[in-house]
C-alpha cells in the first residue's frame, strides 16, 4: 500500500498485491472523517452524494443478503445531496440492521474505470471531500458503533456518529456470491486498485 499527498490536496492510496497461491484479496481504507474538524460534533449535517443506483441490503450481522437493491424511494438514495442525518433514523429495516448507514453501494461508473464515487460537503467550514476510485463498490459507514474509546487528532474521542467512512472496495462477502465482481487473485496475476480522497473548500 502506497500513500501519496499531491499538490492538488489529494490523498492518493495505491494498492498492489501478488500471490503464490490462489487467494482472496479485497483491500480498502477505513479512515474516519469529520470535515468540521476534530472535536466539533457529529457528522449528521454533512451533505453527502453517492453516485450509485443500487446498494447491498444486509442481514442483522451486516452481511449482504445477495442481489443489490435499487436506492430509488429509500433512505439510501444519495444521488442528489442529502445531509447524513436527514433520514438516518427513519423506520427502515435496513437502517435498523446497521443502527444507521453501514452499507455497500454499487457504483454507477463503468467497472474498473477511475471515476467519482462520492462527495461530502460540510457547510460550516466549507470543506469538500471527493472520493475517486477504480473499485466497483463504496461502503458508507456513519459511525453508528463509535463509543468514544477510539481517539483521533488531538486526542479527541470519536463518539457516536462523530465521523464517517467512505471505503472504496469490492463488495463485502464477494467469495460467497459468484455474481459479484471477483476478488480472487491467482499466481502470476497482480492486484491493483487506486482510491483518491480529494479535498477543497467551497466558497
Regions found by a protein language model. Give the residues of each.
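An exposed, glycine/acidic-rich loop-and-rim segment of catalytic or binding clefts
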Residues: 1-203
Amino acid at each position: 500500500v502506497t500513500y501519496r499527498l499531491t499538490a492538488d490536496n489529494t490523498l492518493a492510496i495505491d494498492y498492489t498485491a501478488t500471490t503464490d497461491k490462489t487467494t482472496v484479496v479485497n483491500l480498502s481504507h477505513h479512515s474516519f472523517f469529520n470535515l468540521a474538524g476534530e472535536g466539533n460534533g457529529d457528522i449528521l449535517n454533512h451533505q453527502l452524494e453517492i453516485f450509485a443506483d443500487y446498494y447491498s441490503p444486509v442481514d442483522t450481522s451486516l452481511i449482504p443478503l445477495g442481489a443489490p437493491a435499487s436506492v430509488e424511494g429509500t433512505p439510501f438514495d444519495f444521488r442528489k445531496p442529502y445531509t447524513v442525518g436527514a433520514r438516518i433514523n427513519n423506520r427502515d429495516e435496513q437502517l435498523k440492521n446497521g443502527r444507521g448507514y453501514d452499507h455497500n453501494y454499487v457504483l454507477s461508473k463503468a467497472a474498473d474505470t477511475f471515476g467519482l464515487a462520492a462527495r461530502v460537503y460540510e457547510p460550516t467550514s466549507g470543506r469538500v471531500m471527493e472520493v475517486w476510485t477504480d473499485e466497483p463498490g463504496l461502503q458508507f459507514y456513519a459511525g453508528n458503533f463509535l463509543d468514544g474509546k477510539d481517539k483521533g487528532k488531538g486526542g479527541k474521542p470519536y463518539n457516536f456518529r462523530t465521523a464517517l467512512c467512505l471505503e472504496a472496495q469490492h463488495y463485502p462477502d464477494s467469495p460467497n456470491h459468484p455474481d459479484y465482481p471477483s476478488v480472487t487473485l491467482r499466481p502470476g496475476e497482480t492486484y491493483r486498485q487506486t482510491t483518491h480522497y480529494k479535498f477543497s473548500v467551497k466558497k
